[in-house]
Amino acid sequence: GNRYVTGYITGLLVRLSLLTDRALPEEVAVMKAKAFDYLNEEALKEYRAIRKAEKNGTKITTLSDATMEYMYLVALGSVKLSGEYAKMFDYFLTKLGRNLVNGTMICKAQTAIILQKQGRRTEANEFIASIKEHLVQTDEMGAHFAFHANPYTWGMMPVPAHVAVMEALREAGGNDALIEEMKLWLLKQKQTTSWNSPVATAD
């Protein structure tokens, strides 16, 4: 399997059950469980490599995009971890603080959701506040990121970043009006941009 592709598909399955508020059909639920088994093992490999590097004196301050995606999926899917997986996840949690300064919008949104699901609301709200600092609002375009004109310098794709932030704001609560404004920007993108990749459409 491929960690990125498996993570992407798992994300769709997790969101699907959340959006429909229904349990997944049995065969799909089995597929999701197998996907998490694979992602757990891949994350564990990375965790062991990090711990080994630290023992050898390397300072690890941030996590890979794949590990951030994994933590986000575990949080969003309310996956229960035990044993070494739980220990690994707790360790990863200690590395999230640096994302406040260095993280892309997707990374900050994911971190906010992870912390929210861990009951660490105060820390999650710091990330939400940081995200809001970058949002601009106009009557015509709604709420959006000013740097969308040149997003790749920010290491992000505009639509997935926008959607990830909406998800984080929804999870934090009390942002309904802002989310509606962000929907307006998305609708404008749909009108002016051809979403010809399945990834953009799915997001």
Residue ranges of each PLM-predicted region?
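Large, well-folded core regions of big proteins
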Residues: G1-D203
